[in-house]
């Protein structure tokens, strides 16, 4: 896996979502593969949803996560060395928790855990 992507994964997993987005912006500008650009844009959107959630905007976060989930299928089960299937599961769990919270079925609005990016062995 490319060193820049590994660094970006570290940023994401440490909750540094704005820096993660910046790292992906620089990677997107250097790739010519449209599928790779689309994947990085998808990951940036996931990070933006998590930023919205950290700001307390559950409704926008829910909408953005739902949109990202619908676009994730074309990159399953792995893409560029990342376990997309595991990320999708994390996002589905988070989306379910957000929906339960908004429906009043869950007392705690904060997620039990945030999605993580997992690097697969080569």
Q: What spans do the regions from the language model cover?
A:
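Amphipathic alpha-helical segments of tetratricopeptide repeats
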Residues: 25-30, 69-77
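Alpha-helical segment of the N-proximal tetratricopeptide repeat
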Residues: 3-19
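TPR-repeat structural position
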Residues: 17-18, 58-59, 65
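TPR/TPR-like alpha-solenoid helical repeat scaffolds
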Residues: 43-47, 76-101
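Alpha-helical solenoid repeat scaffolds, predominantly canonical TPR units
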Residues: 23-24, 45, 64, 71
